[in-house]
Design a protein with these regions (language model features):
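Glycine-rich FAD pyrophosphate-binding loop
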Residues: 2-16
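Short beta-strand/turn micro-motifs composed of small residues
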Residues: 5, 63, 164
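Conserved beta-strand termini and adjacent loop/short-helix elements that scaffold enzyme active sites
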Residues: 6, 56, 90, 109, ...
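Rossmann-like dinucleotide-binding core of oxidoreductases
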Residues: 8-10, 21, 62, 168
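Dinucleotide-binding Rossmann-like beta1-alpha1 core, especially the glycine-rich loop
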Residues: 19-97
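Glycine-rich nucleotide phosphate-binding loop and flanking beta-alpha elements
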Residues: 68, 137, 167-170
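Helical element adjacent to the flavin cofactor pocket in flavoenzyme catalytic cores
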Residues: 106-149, 155-159, 163-164
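Flavin (primarily FAD) binding-site architecture
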Residues: 162-175
């Protein structure tokens, strides 16, 4: 197992995001997908905390713009666990966030503000990482794959896991 990263270090090229939010992806109809999202959020929070990647241990989701306020109103009318989705007025939102906020919203106590690069480094553990491996072409060779980097290097693997973010459609079209 080896990780190839296009940037100069693990998780440094991923759209330049130095920070990320971990929040639940709930659906209005309170279905299995929402339940899975809630479970995944608890796991993600645990992983981020264990990695030392957590910068803030809750997320305040504001009732703004109006579309988001209407969506969150529907969530507030449902029966979600209090620590997953806690309604707050603007005074409480201000207190929770530590800065003046003009509107209320909901607090996700298991939400996190994280440092993605630190989380990726923790999850990778001792797995070898090859950096500056900006893959520009993938071809099949026998039962394996050959990956060609922009700088001329080639990598041969029997199996790959592709995690290229916005570049995924282009990467998959080469397979």
């Amino acid at each position: 197992t080896t990780i190839l990263d296009a940037g100069p270090g693990l998780a440094t090229a991923a759209s330049g995001n130095r920070l990320a939010l971990q929040t639940p992806r709930l659906t209005i109809d309170h279905n299995d997908a929402s339940q899975l999202s809630a479970s995944c959020l608890a796991y993600a929070a645990h992983c981020s905390d264990a990695a030392g990647a957590t910068l803030a241990d809750k997320v305040v989701s504001l009732d703004w713009p109006d579309r988001e306020a209407a969506r969150q109103d529907k969530f507030r009318s449902q029966f979600w666990p209090y620590d997953l989705l806690r309604p707050v007025d603007f005074d409480t939102a201000t207190l929770e966030a530590g800065i003046a906020l003009p509107v209320g919203g909901v607090v996700h106590d298991f939400g996190r503000v994280i440092e993605p690069a630190r989380l990726c480094q923790h999850l990778a553990g001792p797995t070898p990482v090859i950096t500056n491996a900006d893959i520009v072409k993938i071809t099949r060779q026998g039962r394996g794959l050959v990956l060609f980097a922009k700088n001329g290097r080639q990598f041969n693997y029997e199996q790959i896991v592709v995690a290229t973010g916005a570049g995924l459609p282009e990467s998959l079209s080469q397979l």
